[in-house]
Amino acid sequence: MSQFVLEIGTEELPARFLPALERELAERFTRALADAGIECDPVCVMSTPRRAVVRMDAVNPVQSESEEVVTGPPARIAFTPEGGLTKAAEGFARTQGVEVADIFRLTTDKGEYIAVRKHMGGARSIDLLRDICPAIIGALPFPKRMRWGSGDFTYARPMRWLLALFDESVVDFEVGGVRSGNITYGHRIHGAGPLTVAHAGDYERVIREQGGVTPVGEERRNAVVTGGNTLATAAGGKVIWKDSLLDEVQGLVEHPVPCLGNIDPSFLELPREVLLTSMESHQKSFGVEDAEGRLMPHFLTVLNLTPLDGDLVRKGWERVLRARLEDARFFWKTDLASSFDAWLASLDNVIFLGPLGSMGDKTRRLEQLCAWLASEVGFDDATAAARAGRLSKGDLVSGMVGEFDTLQGIMGGIYARRMGEAEAVAAAIAEQYLPAGPDSPVPSSMCGALLSIADKADTLAGCFGLGMIPTGAADPYALRRCVLGIARIILEHGLQLDVRGLFAKAFALYGERAWKLAPEDALVKLDEFFMARLRNLFIANGYETLLVEAVLAAGCDDVRSAGARLEALAAFSRRDDFASAVLTFKRAANIIRKQGGDSDVALDGAWKADLLVEDAERHLAASLEAMFPRFDGLWAEGDYPALFGLLGELRPVVDGFFEGVMVMSDDAALRTNRLNLLQALVGRLSRLADFGALQM
């Protein structure tokens, strides 16, 4: 077996590009090699800011061979009466690239045809890779591409060299004006190069030992963590690792060297969030804390070289960070000298969304919507909820959030505490943007949960009213995240809340607006949008698609109820008699769906006892009369597992009804009475789930 390596050398790529680049290279090479019939071990991909590497340690030097029988026209067309070949046969041979002497007769189920045997494969893998490599490189997707020089080729950053070796041979091709070879370049300081790689198997040794490059991202990450922990422990603390920043940092360096710096202890008067954000956002550095979780006057940064004078480099980093922290301290002191009243006045000059007014208007709507929500869910501190809604956006015009926009809400909560607001108000302001994503927690406080719901509902109503409905991947106002956030908060806090009523209230608080969609039409579209996202959320949480759709078809305005019904139905589906129950109740639902609309008499679920002539229908009627009070009581309590248990008890009776009674009797009165019996049953069933949607 042979070895292959491809290195795409570029100017520094953004760290955020590297994970997707590795995935694309692995998937595309794996697929291309399989399609070409080249057998090889799994494709290994590595990347640094200046290179993307594809390596295969065991590649078959020759393409897999096979023989294929290609069928041509029928023999009656291919041969003349005298047995010679017709022009049709000659054309077939020419098309297949074979001699006419290679044609033979092939008997099939459909008759006799002519055919040829074609030898497939057997090409040298290196020759196939000459076409595969440039095709893949040119098709790699990036969030942004650029041109350089005078050519039209585009890539994420200018391409500077290409190394492509199959064992000791160069895989010769050209991309973007760059021709492949056996030359690579190492770290700009520790092994700039050019470096010659004699054999594909030597690449990693050369780039590590001569080039001073750590090509594997996970190794760079581990080096940062191990070295950083050692330095922090020696200083009596521990590093505050942040995974997203750690991933970014390892993608910024080829030769990671952790470095512990110091900050003036006087800066520790700043809020923890401000200090960490200053370090992380501007300097790509990590904070250090003691065993009690208090910040220490240190920070950890990562260098891209081993410095000759470590103290000099450290002091340079300290000087730059000090300037950032001085700015933060200035904003902190300036903001504390202001007030929420001043900020709220300024919000009237900050546009929310075009025709939807100012951020000041939004806070006044949130004040009312939070108070309404508190009443709807039975929260006993509506005053705090309303106050949180009014103050929620004040920090947007503060100096600190102007500098560090990721601190919006967080700084509002900090300032609210410093300015004497109730703890519930301050906590709610700090939590208003939660959850920030699928892995982000929801607000922990009830006041924060209500403010977050109100904020998201207000944005959804406004955007849908203006026709700003997400399509495809485009969602500039993160409306999908808003919907999922509302659903998660309701589910995780167990709130009994009618979301349709919530959206209707949010629309009403806008008053008269120049909507592009009438509020009633926008509400319908918003309901559909919410239901689709809720469906995705339940499926992502591990529930079967059919169960989710059956529950949502029974109604999802009360999200808590939908979630509880789904959990109960999932448990019911694990019972041995589930399939039988579904078939029984689905039959009832389908009869009502099909026949109910065709009945001459409207079905209201009220049957007449004197028209119950068969024992089976009298038994069903008696069972329903006994079951309905229990059902309604359990429904009021929200005891859905017990409700599905009732259905299990009722199933044999319904089966007996179907076995012993002709529902569609020729007697119209009997037929309508029996349909009403089923309507009464289905009316209760349809509150739990749409059994007609289940497939068994």
From Swiss-Prot:
GO terms for cellular component: cytosol. It is an enzyme of class 6 (ligase). It is found in: Cytoplasm. It holds the Pfam family tRNA_synt_2f. It catalyses: tRNA(Gly) + glycine + ATP = glycyl-tRNA(Gly) + AMP + diphosphate. Its EC number is 6.1.1.14. One of its GO terms (biological process) is arginyl-tRNA aminoacylation. PROSITE patterns: AA_TRNA_LIGASE_II_GLYAB. It comes from the Bacteria. Keywords: Aminoacyl-tRNA synthetase, ATP-binding, Cytoplasm, Ligase, Nucleotide-binding, Protein biosynthesis. InterPro entries: DALR_anticod-bd, Gly-tRNA-synth_bsu, Gly-tRNA-synth_heterodimer. GO terms for molecular function: arginine-tRNA ligase activity; ATP binding; glycine-tRNA ligase activity. HAMAP family: Gly_tRNA_synth_beta. Belongs to the class-II aminoacyl-tRNA synthetase family. Tetramer of two alpha and two beta subunits. NCBIfam families: glyS (TIGR00211). This is Glycine--tRNA ligase beta subunit.
